UniProtKB/Swiss-Prot annotation:
Short name of any one Pfam family annotated for the protein: GBP_PSP
Keyword Disulfide bond included in the entry's annotation: yes
Taxonomic source organism: Spodoptera exigua (Beet armyworm)
Tissue expression remark: Hemolymph.
GO annotation, cellular component aspect: extracellular space
Function comment: Causes rapid, rigid paralysis when injected into Lepidopteran larvae. The physiological role may be to reduce hemolymph loss following injury and promote wound healing.
Family: Belongs to the GBP/PSP1/paralytic peptide family.
Keywords: Cytokine, Disulfide bond
Descriptive protein name: Paralytic peptide 3
Protein backbone atom coordinates (compact mmCIF):
# COMPACT_ATOMS: atom_id res chain seq x y z
CA UNK A 1 0.00 0.00 0.00
CA UNK A 2 2.28 2.73 -1.27
CA UNK A 3 -0.22 5.42 -2.13
CA UNK A 4 0.67 9.09 -2.31
CA UNK A 5 -0.98 10.75 0.67
CA UNK A 6 -2.66 7.47 1.57
CA UNK A 7 -5.51 8.06 -0.87
CA UNK A 8 -7.58 5.52 -2.71
CA UNK A 9 -5.82 3.79 -5.66
CA UNK A 10 -6.07 6.06 -8.70
CA UNK A 11 -6.28 9.16 -6.53
CA UNK A 12 -3.60 11.64 -5.51
CA UNK A 13 -3.49 14.02 -2.57
CA UNK A 14 -3.40 17.69 -3.53
CA UNK A 15 -1.75 20.60 -1.73
CA UNK A 16 -4.98 21.42 0.09
CA UNK A 17 -5.05 17.94 1.60
CA UNK A 18 -7.80 16.57 -0.61
CA UNK A 19 -7.77 13.47 -2.81
CA UNK A 20 -8.49 14.02 -6.48
CA UNK A 21 -8.62 11.44 -9.30
CA UNK A 22 -5.58 11.34 -11.55
CA UNK A 23 -7.51 9.98 -14.52
Amino acid sequence: ENFVGGCTPGYQRTADGRCKPTF
